[in-house]
């Protein structure tokens, strides 16, 4: 099915907000509008198979697919707004780029978490450092890592050596686990959680503190890892959460007790529709409901390009 023909009824990328996201203000949406957009984005991404997405990554041709055009515009929007935005207090500016990828700006720093995009290396010159939760291709790309490493910028992960943030054991393995450090005005605490039943302690969760504001990013979290979730520095102001890979949403929400939750990993195009690594409409709606039932009233999704705070 052709890209444009399949998505002709969808709204323009800039539409669909009650208050437009910009360099000076985050997006906000009524719950009813969010529900409508979930359905429309689900239809718009359905036409893009993993094979088509792979071709786009290789040659940059969107082939008229609405979702791929949206992905290009999202990147340009976030880069433009990140350059234009000034942060004065402890509360950072946070943008959703794609999947579990976010850009965060504080008073002194600009950094990424799990940034993945065809053009992600273009951000390297702007960033002070980057965080990567785990060694899967939908959470990091070699070109981006190479650009950061080549520019002598810190990349924090649990699988790459970079400027002393992570040390090697004498036997050649990696020191993995809880580590706390500071980069400019950002304090970071790492811990390990399970990606799924067999990738135990595979994901590095990041507790990120700027002043008194706490962001918690848990990458991919799987079934049974709920007891490992949680922050040491206080209740998270914002939890960037993927309720897939088998994690029990209600148990996780009760354990973390975040003030606000934003779901990520939406419509990850490298996975086929229906795969648990791709949060589609079928699974998204009940998990939004489960998070609210578990006690978090402020739970939402971030579409590509949204400024969250």
Q: Could you say what each language-model-derived stretch is?
A:
Residues 131, 156, 189, 240, ...:
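Hydrophobic/aromatic beta-strand patches that form the interior of the parallel beta-sheet core
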Residues 104, 134, 188, 220, ...:
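Divalent metal-coordination and catalytic microenvironments
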């Amino acid at each position: 099915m052709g890209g444009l023909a399949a998505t002709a009824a969808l709204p323009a990328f800039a539409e669909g907000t009650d208050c437009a996201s910009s360099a000076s203000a985050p997006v906000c949406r009524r719950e009813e509008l969010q529900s409508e957009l979930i359905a429309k984005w689900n239809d718009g991404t359905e036409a893009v198979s993993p094979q088509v997405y792979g071709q786009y990554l290789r040659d940059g041709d969107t082939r008229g697919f609405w979702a791929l055009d949206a992905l290009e515009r999202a990147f340009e929007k976030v880069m433009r707004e990140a350059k234009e935005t000034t942060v004065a207090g402890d509360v950072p500016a946070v943008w959703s780029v794609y999947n579990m990828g976010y850009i965060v700006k504080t008073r002194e720093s600009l950094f990424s978490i799990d940034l993945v995009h065809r053009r992600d290396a273009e951000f390297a010159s702007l960033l002070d450092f980057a965080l990567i939760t785990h060694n899967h291709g939908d959470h990091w790309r070699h070109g981006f890592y190479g650009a950061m490493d080549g520019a002598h910028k810190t990349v924090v992960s649990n699988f790459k050596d970079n400027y002393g943030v992570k040390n090697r054991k004498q036997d050649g393995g990696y020191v993995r686990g809880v580590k706390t450090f500071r980069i400019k005005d950002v304090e970071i605490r790492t811990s390990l959680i399970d990606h799924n039943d067999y990738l135990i302690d595979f994901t590095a969760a990041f507790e990120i503190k700027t002043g008194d504001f706490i962001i918690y990013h848990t990458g991919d979290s799987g079934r049974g890892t709920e007891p490992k979730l949680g922050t040491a520095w206080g209740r998270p102001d914002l939890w960037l959460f993927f309720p897939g890979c088998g994690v029990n949403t209600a148990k996780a929400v009760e354990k973390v007790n975040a003030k606000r939750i934003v779901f990520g990993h939406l419509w990850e195009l490298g996975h086929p529709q229906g795969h648990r690594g791709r949060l589609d409409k079928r699974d998204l709606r009940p998990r939004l409901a489960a998070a609210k039932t578990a006690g978090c009233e402020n739970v939402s999704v971030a579409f590509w390009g949204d400024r969250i705070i």
